[in-house]
Amino acid sequence: MAAKVASTSSEEAEGSLVTEGEMGEKALPVVYKRYICSFADCGAAYNKNWKLQAHLCKHTGEKPFPCKEEGCEKGFTSLHHLTRHSLTHTGEKNFTCDSDGCDLRFTTKANMKKHFNRFHNIKICVYVCHFENCGKAFKKHNQLKVHQFSHTQQLPYECPHEGCDKRFSLPSRLKRHEKVHAGYPCKKDDSCSFVGKTWTLYLKHVAECHQDLAVCDVCNRKFRHKDYLRDHQKTHEKERTVYLCPRDGCDRSYTTAFNLRSHIQSFHEEQRPFVCEHAGCGKCFAMKKSLERHSVVHDPEKRKLKEKCPRPKRSLASRLTGYIPPKSKEKNASVSGTEKTDSLVKNKPSGTETNGSLVLDKLTIQ
């Protein structure tokens, strides 16, 4: 094992002594924790060596006690945990409930005690139902309130917000509901007054308004997502991967697999399942990402981030290959769009079909 047990001098043992004053009135017996974790910034100490060895496994990641059952790859940090786990394979239940009239059996003694204290140990059940002919007792007050629903048919936890008469069966559900009234205020920026009605709306707001923009180190264009930036950076490469359409009779090529998939779905398969729900629009798209990009058109706030310089009209050749020529060359270009297309198609290498869908080739842009 990577870590060894640290030496335990009398001073170290004294330092890890648990006293009655530290534990309060209900103090445990005084215990010397002689086995101390040697990992930096840990400070865990134990009174038995096997407990320390099991703890060290948390640092090293080791599980020295593997399950030997065929097909089971689980491992454990202590023999006790392995023994308890092995009972799930054998199905043995050697521990029987001690209460009269109860013959339930359990795989471990701890599970048997838990059952006994929950259902048979009346001494620790301090919350008793006083409805006629009931008398059931519970350890926790919220358990009693949940039980009383069977008598009153009224959920026990009522929303305290004025004008809201909703009720819930559990305090956790009431707490979650109260967020509807309080909301989720944005804490990313002191000047932001957004309050989300739900956690989902809050996360959506953070992603759209407070996400760090990814900046291209060549042209300084900004993008909301890093994958958009990666796609954009390919336009600056001299040698680029070209995706050729594998469909018979189609010589289209694209610089991203996304554009090729979009082309196949919308043009060849005529599938455009993503419809813009903005009133009066109704445009359809083959890819969800295309719809998300289009939605910026209808959102003035998003359009602010999409400001960019006007781009000159692209030739047919540049649209087919995805290549955008420099501005200086674009101005001085005297070759017609048809001639550019012919020269690029002639020099386009024949691709190899991959799984009948995508074809990749290298094309050097000069």
UniProtKB/Swiss-Prot annotation:
The PTM Phosphoserine maps to 38, 336
Reported tissue expression = Synthesized in oocytes and, in much lower levels, in somatic cells.
Q: Where would one find coiled-coil regions in this protein?
A: none
Gene Ontology terms: cellular component = nucleus
The reply to whether RNA-binding figures as a keyword in the UniProt entry is yes
Here the segments flagged for biased composition (Basic and acidic residues) are 299-310
Provide a Gene Ontology MF annotation, just one. DNA binding
What's an example GO BP annotation here? ribosomal large subunit biogenesis
Spell out the post-translational modification annotation for this entry: The N-terminus is blocked.
Q: Per its UniProt record, what Pfam families does this chain match?
A: TFIIIA_zf-C2H2 (PF22110), zf-C2H2 (PF00096)
Which stretches are zinc fingers (C2H2-type)?
A: 35-59, 65-89, 95-120, 127-151, 157-181, 184-210, 214-236, 243-268, 274-298
**Where does the source fall among the domains of life?**
Eukaryota
Identify the stretch(es) annotated as Disordered.
299-366
User: Does the UniProt entry include the keyword Ribonucleoprotein?
Assistant: no
Cell compartments where the protein resides: Nucleus
The protein's UniProt keywords, in alphabetical order, are: DNA-binding, Metal-binding, Nucleus, Phosphoprotein, Repeat, Ribosome biogenesis, RNA-binding, Transcription, Transcription regulation, Zinc, Zinc-finger
Give the PANTHER family listed for this entry: TRANSCRIPTION FACTOR IIIA (PTHR46179:SF1), ZINC FINGER PROTEIN (PTHR46179)
Give the function comment from the record.
Involved in ribosomal large subunit biogenesis. Acts both as a positive transcription factor for 5S RNA genes, and as a specific RNA binding protein that complexes with 5S RNA in oocytes to form the 7S ribonucleoprotein storage particle. May play an essential role in the developmental change in 5S RNA gene expression. Interacts with the internal control region (ICR) of approximately 50 bases within the 5S RNA genes, is required for correct transcription of these genes by RNA polymerase III. Also binds the transcribed 5S RNA's.
By what name is this protein known?
A: Transcription factor IIIA
Organism of derivation: Xenopus laevis (African clawed frog)
Name of the gene? gtf3a
